[in-house]
Amino acid sequence: MKVLNLNVFRGFHTQFHSVYKWENRRDLIINLIEAENPDIILFQECNKLQNTEDMEKFMEDLPNYDYVIKYSLPGVFRSRALIIAYNPNKLIKNSEIVKWFSDTPDVPSIGWGNPDDDFGRIILGCEFLEKNSDKKFWIFNVHFDIDVESIRKSILLLPELIDKQCLSDSKIILAGDFNTDDKLLFDTLKNNNFDRLSQTFNTTDKVKLNVSFVGKRDNFGKLTEDLYLDHVFGREVYNYNIYCPFEYDFIINKYIVSDHLPVVIIFE
Protein backbone atom coordinates (compact mmCIF):
# COMPACT_ATOMS: atom_id res chain seq x y z
CA MET A 1 0.00 0.00 0.00
CA LYS A 2 1.16 3.50 -0.83
CA VAL A 3 -0.04 6.49 1.20
CA LEU A 4 0.66 10.17 0.52
CA ASN A 5 0.34 12.64 3.39
CA LEU A 6 0.20 16.42 2.87
CA ASN A 7 -0.99 19.51 4.67
CA VAL A 8 -2.43 21.40 1.69
CA PHE A 9 -1.91 24.85 3.28
CA ARG A 10 -5.35 26.40 3.14
CA GLY A 11 -4.86 28.75 6.06
CA PHE A 12 -7.17 31.74 5.87
CA HIS A 13 -4.23 34.14 5.33
CA THR A 14 -3.22 32.35 2.11
CA GLN A 15 -6.20 33.56 0.08
CA PHE A 16 -4.52 36.73 -1.14
CA HIS A 17 -0.86 35.69 -1.09
CA SER A 18 0.84 36.40 -4.42
CA VAL A 19 2.68 33.06 -4.45
CA TYR A 20 0.82 30.73 -2.11
CA LYS A 21 -2.81 31.45 -2.94
CA TRP A 22 -4.71 28.27 -3.71
CA GLU A 23 -5.12 28.97 -7.43
CA ASN A 24 -1.33 28.89 -7.84
CA ARG A 25 -0.89 25.57 -6.08
CA ARG A 26 -3.91 23.35 -6.69
CA ASP A 27 -2.58 21.95 -9.97
CA LEU A 28 0.81 21.30 -8.37
CA ILE A 29 -0.94 19.07 -5.84
CA ILE A 30 -2.81 17.26 -8.61
CA ASN A 31 0.46 16.78 -10.51
CA LEU A 32 2.03 15.34 -7.37
CA ILE A 33 -0.84 12.88 -6.89
CA GLU A 34 -0.74 11.81 -10.53
CA ALA A 35 3.04 11.32 -10.41
CA GLU A 36 3.04 9.28 -7.20
CA ASN A 37 -0.25 7.45 -7.81
CA PRO A 38 -0.87 6.63 -4.13
CA ASP A 39 -3.52 4.16 -3.05
CA ILE A 40 -4.52 6.44 -0.16
CA ILE A 41 -4.23 10.22 0.31
CA LEU A 42 -4.25 12.05 3.62
CA PHE A 43 -4.89 15.79 3.39
CA GLN A 44 -4.85 18.21 6.32
CA GLU A 45 -6.03 21.84 6.47
CA CYS A 46 -8.88 21.30 4.03
CA ASN A 47 -10.63 24.42 5.33
CA LYS A 48 -13.24 26.28 3.36
CA LEU A 49 -12.03 29.64 2.02
CA GLN A 50 -14.19 32.61 1.13
CA ASN A 51 -12.70 33.40 -2.26
CA THR A 52 -11.81 30.08 -3.84
CA GLU A 53 -13.09 26.58 -4.50
CA ASP A 54 -13.89 24.17 -1.68
CA MET A 55 -11.94 20.95 -1.39
CA GLU A 56 -15.03 19.04 -2.51
CA LYS A 57 -14.74 20.84 -5.86
CA PHE A 58 -10.98 20.25 -5.98
CA MET A 59 -11.46 16.51 -5.45
CA GLU A 60 -13.47 16.36 -8.68
CA ASP A 61 -10.11 16.68 -10.45
CA LEU A 62 -8.98 13.44 -8.80
CA PRO A 63 -11.71 11.22 -10.28
CA ASN A 64 -9.90 7.96 -9.57
CA TYR A 65 -10.40 8.42 -5.83
CA ASP A 66 -13.34 8.14 -3.50
CA TYR A 67 -12.93 10.18 -0.34
CA VAL A 68 -14.20 11.09 3.11
CA ILE A 69 -14.07 14.71 4.30
CA LYS A 70 -14.93 15.66 7.86
CA TYR A 71 -15.21 19.11 9.43
CA SER A 72 -14.46 19.85 13.06
CA LEU A 73 -17.60 21.97 13.51
CA PRO A 74 -20.02 21.13 10.68
CA GLY A 75 -21.73 24.23 9.35
CA VAL A 76 -19.23 26.63 10.93
CA PHE A 77 -17.20 28.46 8.28
CA ARG A 78 -13.81 28.32 10.00
CA SER A 79 -14.01 24.62 10.81
CA ARG A 80 -10.84 22.62 10.31
CA ALA A 81 -11.22 19.68 7.92
CA LEU A 82 -9.43 16.44 7.02
CA ILE A 83 -9.66 14.18 3.97
CA ILE A 84 -8.90 10.50 3.51
CA ALA A 85 -9.09 9.56 -0.17
CA TYR A 86 -8.61 6.05 -1.56
CA ASN A 87 -8.55 4.05 -4.77
CA PRO A 88 -11.82 2.06 -4.86
CA ASN A 89 -10.39 -0.36 -7.41
CA LYS A 90 -7.96 -1.60 -4.76
CA LEU A 91 -9.70 -0.89 -1.47
CA ILE A 92 -13.05 -1.28 0.21
CA LYS A 93 -13.80 1.15 3.04
CA ASN A 94 -15.30 -0.94 5.83
CA SER A 95 -15.87 1.85 8.33
CA GLU A 96 -14.96 5.42 9.25
CA ILE A 97 -14.78 7.34 12.51
CA VAL A 98 -14.20 10.91 13.56
CA LYS A 99 -13.35 12.04 17.09
CA TRP A 100 -12.60 15.44 18.61
CA PHE A 101 -9.53 16.48 20.56
CA SER A 102 -11.51 17.91 23.44
CA ASP A 103 -13.07 17.07 26.78
CA THR A 104 -16.04 15.65 24.84
CA PRO A 105 -14.38 13.68 22.01
CA ASP A 106 -17.55 11.95 20.81
CA VAL A 107 -19.37 15.12 19.74
CA PRO A 108 -18.43 18.21 17.70
CA SER A 109 -16.58 20.46 20.11
CA ILE A 110 -13.76 22.92 20.51
CA GLY A 111 -10.58 21.88 22.25
CA TRP A 112 -8.01 23.48 24.51
CA GLY A 113 -6.54 26.13 22.22
CA ASN A 114 -6.84 29.90 22.05
CA PRO A 115 -10.56 30.64 22.61
CA ASP A 116 -10.46 33.27 19.85
CA ASP A 117 -9.07 30.82 17.29
CA ASP A 118 -10.31 27.40 18.37
CA PHE A 119 -12.67 25.84 15.87
CA GLY A 120 -12.04 22.26 16.87
CA ARG A 121 -9.48 19.63 15.93
CA ILE A 122 -10.29 16.09 14.89
CA ILE A 123 -8.86 12.67 14.16
CA LEU A 124 -10.32 10.89 11.12
CA GLY A 125 -9.92 7.15 10.70
CA CYS A 126 -10.93 4.56 8.09
CA GLU A 127 -10.66 0.80 8.12
CA PHE A 128 -9.88 -0.63 4.69
CA LEU A 129 -9.98 -4.07 3.11
CA GLU A 130 -7.49 -4.83 0.34
CA LYS A 131 -9.41 -6.41 -2.51
CA ASN A 132 -6.56 -8.61 -3.73
CA SER A 133 -5.60 -10.04 -0.34
CA ASP A 134 -8.56 -9.63 2.04
CA LYS A 135 -6.18 -7.96 4.51
CA LYS A 136 -7.59 -5.25 6.76
CA PHE A 137 -5.85 -2.19 8.14
CA TRP A 138 -6.64 1.19 9.68
CA ILE A 139 -5.50 4.62 8.50
CA PHE A 140 -5.72 7.61 10.86
CA ASN A 141 -5.27 11.24 9.82
CA VAL A 142 -4.64 13.98 12.41
CA HIS A 143 -3.96 17.71 12.57
CA PHE A 144 -3.18 19.11 16.00
CA ASP A 145 -3.70 22.70 17.13
CA ILE A 146 -0.65 24.99 17.38
CA ASP A 147 -1.35 25.81 21.04
CA VAL A 148 1.20 24.10 23.31
CA GLU A 149 -1.29 23.01 25.98
CA SER A 150 -3.73 21.77 23.35
CA ILE A 151 -0.94 19.73 21.75
CA ARG A 152 -0.03 18.18 25.10
CA LYS A 153 -3.60 17.17 25.89
CA SER A 154 -4.16 15.90 22.33
CA ILE A 155 -1.08 13.69 22.58
CA LEU A 156 -2.30 12.14 25.81
CA LEU A 157 -5.81 11.54 24.43
CA LEU A 158 -4.70 10.18 21.05
CA PRO A 159 -3.97 6.52 21.98
CA GLU A 160 -7.31 6.18 23.75
CA LEU A 161 -9.23 7.46 20.73
CA ILE A 162 -7.50 4.94 18.47
CA ASP A 163 -7.70 1.96 20.82
CA LYS A 164 -11.45 2.37 21.23
CA GLN A 165 -11.82 1.67 17.50
CA CYS A 166 -9.17 -0.96 16.81
CA LEU A 167 -8.36 -4.44 18.00
CA SER A 168 -5.01 -4.79 19.77
CA ASP A 169 -3.49 -6.65 16.80
CA SER A 170 -4.86 -4.31 14.11
CA LYS A 171 -2.43 -2.99 11.52
CA ILE A 172 -2.48 0.80 11.83
CA ILE A 173 -0.89 3.74 10.04
CA LEU A 174 -1.16 7.04 11.93
CA ALA A 175 0.04 10.14 10.09
CA GLY A 176 -0.55 13.85 9.75
CA ASP A 177 0.52 17.28 10.90
CA PHE A 178 1.16 17.01 14.63
CA ASN A 179 2.52 20.58 14.91
CA THR A 180 5.24 19.33 17.25
CA ASP A 181 8.33 17.18 17.52
CA ASP A 182 8.15 17.08 21.31
CA LYS A 183 9.49 13.96 23.00
CA LEU A 184 6.12 13.52 24.71
CA LEU A 185 4.57 12.60 21.35
CA PHE A 186 7.12 9.90 20.59
CA ASP A 187 7.20 8.49 24.12
CA THR A 188 3.42 8.39 24.48
CA LEU A 189 2.92 6.53 21.22
CA LYS A 190 5.83 4.18 21.90
CA ASN A 191 4.29 3.32 25.27
CA ASN A 192 1.11 2.44 23.40
CA ASN A 193 2.82 0.06 20.96
CA PHE A 194 3.33 2.46 18.06
CA ASP A 195 6.62 2.55 16.17
CA ARG A 196 7.96 5.84 14.85
CA LEU A 197 8.33 5.09 11.14
CA SER A 198 9.36 8.50 9.82
CA GLN A 199 12.78 8.61 11.44
CA THR A 200 14.07 7.46 8.05
CA PHE A 201 12.72 10.29 5.92
CA ASN A 202 14.76 10.96 2.77
CA THR A 203 14.38 12.84 -0.49
CA THR A 204 14.25 10.88 -3.73
CA ASP A 205 17.98 11.53 -4.15
CA LYS A 206 18.63 10.05 -0.67
CA VAL A 207 19.25 13.23 1.32
CA LYS A 208 18.09 12.69 4.90
CA LEU A 209 15.50 15.23 6.03
CA ASN A 210 15.05 16.42 9.59
CA VAL A 211 12.41 18.92 8.53
CA SER A 212 8.88 18.64 7.14
CA PHE A 213 7.64 22.22 7.62
CA VAL A 214 9.52 24.65 5.36
CA GLY A 215 7.27 27.71 5.56
CA LYS A 216 6.79 30.27 2.81
CA ARG A 217 9.60 31.68 0.68
CA ASP A 218 10.76 35.17 1.61
CA ASN A 219 11.31 38.05 -0.81
CA PHE A 220 14.67 36.54 -1.75
CA GLY A 221 13.17 33.15 -2.56
CA LYS A 222 14.53 31.46 0.55
CA LEU A 223 12.51 29.04 2.67
CA THR A 224 11.76 30.51 6.07
CA GLU A 225 11.18 27.55 8.43
CA ASP A 226 12.82 24.24 9.28
CA LEU A 227 10.59 22.36 11.71
CA TYR A 228 9.74 18.66 11.91
CA LEU A 229 5.97 18.60 12.39
CA ASP A 230 4.67 15.83 10.10
CA HIS A 231 5.15 12.28 11.35
CA VAL A 232 4.22 8.70 10.57
CA PHE A 233 3.62 6.01 13.18
CA GLY A 234 2.69 2.38 12.77
CA ARG A 235 1.41 -0.54 14.77
CA GLU A 236 1.97 -4.06 13.44
CA VAL A 237 3.79 -2.50 10.46
CA TYR A 238 7.15 -4.15 9.80
CA ASN A 239 8.02 -3.68 6.13
CA TYR A 240 7.84 -0.07 5.03
CA ASN A 241 9.56 2.82 3.29
CA ILE A 242 9.16 6.56 3.95
CA TYR A 243 10.28 9.34 1.61
CA CYS A 244 9.62 12.85 0.35
CA PRO A 245 8.78 12.62 -3.38
CA PHE A 246 11.13 15.42 -4.48
CA GLU A 247 14.86 15.90 -4.88
CA TYR A 248 16.63 18.01 -2.28
CA ASP A 249 17.70 20.78 -4.69
CA PHE A 250 14.12 21.17 -5.93
CA ILE A 251 12.84 21.50 -2.36
CA ILE A 252 15.42 24.15 -1.47
CA ASN A 253 15.10 26.22 -4.63
CA LYS A 254 11.69 25.68 -6.23
CA TYR A 255 9.18 23.97 -3.95
CA ILE A 256 5.93 25.95 -3.44
CA VAL A 257 3.34 23.14 -3.29
CA SER A 258 2.69 23.88 0.40
CA ASP A 259 4.42 25.15 3.51
CA HIS A 260 4.72 21.46 4.48
CA LEU A 261 6.52 18.74 2.55
CA PRO A 262 4.60 15.69 1.36
CA VAL A 263 5.43 12.38 2.99
CA VAL A 264 4.97 9.07 1.17
CA ILE A 265 4.55 5.83 3.11
CA ILE A 266 4.81 2.44 1.42
CA PHE A 267 3.95 -0.54 3.62
CA GLU A 268 2.94 -4.18 3.37
UniProtKB/Swiss-Prot annotation:
SUPFAM superfamilies: DNase I-like. Disulfide bonds: none annotated. One of its GO terms (molecular function) is 3'-5'-RNA exonuclease activity. Signal peptide: none annotated. It comes from the Viruses. InterPro entries: CCR4/nocturin_mRNA_transcr, Endo/exonu/phosph_ase_sf, Endo/exonuclease/phosphatase. This is Uncharacterized protein L388.
